[in-house]
């Protein structure tokens, strides 16, 4: 018999970093794959909606959830040393930042640029997390997913994961009745520092170490970003838009907007800069507000509702589109009463405008 924790009509406030006070019919913590299989099977047979969360760091619950919220606490790390690289086999319930610290302390380098990113290993793969010039896809070797239909485990190697900016195949083809249970991370023994442009003011290439990069990034993030334990937030609410080179050049000429050319020919534009330079004056809806130091983050100052967060986001979305002709797409997952809701249903996203 697999041990599980059951709670009835429990508040989800402490289980989502936005600290939105909604409830679920049941909240169940699972520590084994078999427990996850058992619970999902019961839900399927009983026609009960269910959703799997890690740290709840990239979600916004729009209302009370009528089904079961499964909290993934499936943990375990196996490190295999090869001649030229390290291979990490990590279960999806492990916290990402804990893995970064562990590897650094063991002298296994390469994850330091992704320090202090909230969430678990599973969401790191699903969202293809990234910061300071490094993304999860750059270190991923494979992702293991569990089919909650037939209980089989399938290994998907990096090239088949369809990783892109804050996206992967796990947000699309495998988003329903599948769960990320384990990832493989490959780190070369020949460490090379990644000095992203925004780090240049804080660090010099002379005598640079992974520890220095880690400490500086942690310091920057703590200074710029709100601690979700103190101020409710889900990190960046919107994605940085990707636009065509010609359109980007016009914006650069007009506004000198921070931009980052991509390998696919598109240009990434700073969404935070767009919001900051719209110059919203004391924009706040109830307890929902824009963070003062990082404009891309929407915060719950105390007791904000999801409706207040969404209303604020809609105003920003509309204003940026009107002034810059750029469509901001939400990065957070929106959760309705029985599951995820497409952002297009709320923000009226026009797919034709995603690349302009």
UniProtKB/Swiss-Prot annotation:
Its EC number is 1.3.1.98. Its cofactor is FAD. It comes from Buchnera aphidicola subsp. Acyrthosiphon pisum (strain APS) (Acyrthosiphon pisum symbiotic bacterium). Cell wall formation. Pathway: Cell wall biogenesis; peptidoglycan biosynthesis. It is an enzyme of class 1 (oxidoreductase). GO terms for biological process: cell division; cell wall organization; peptidoglycan biosynthetic process; regulation of cell shape. The keyword Protein biosynthesis does not apply. Pfam families: FAD_binding_4, MurB_C. It is found in: Cytoplasm. Its main location: cytoplasm. Residues 20-190 form the FAD-binding PCMH-type domain. GO terms for molecular function: FAD binding; UDP-N-acetylmuramate dehydrogenase activity. NCBIfam families: murB, PRK00046.1. PROSITE patterns: FAD_PCMH. Keywords: Cell cycle, Cell division, Cell shape, Cell wall biogenesis/degradation, Cytoplasm, FAD, Flavoprotein, NADP, Oxidoreductase, Peptidoglycan synthesis. This is UDP-N-acetylenolpyruvoylglucosamine reductase. Belongs to the MurB family. It catalyses: UDP-N-acetyl-alpha-D-muramate + NADP(+) = UDP-N-acetyl-3-O-(1-carboxyvinyl)-alpha-D-glucosamine + NADPH + H(+). The active site is at 166, 236 (proton donor), 331. GO terms for cellular component: cytosol. The gene is murB. It comes from the Bacteria. The keyword NADP applies.
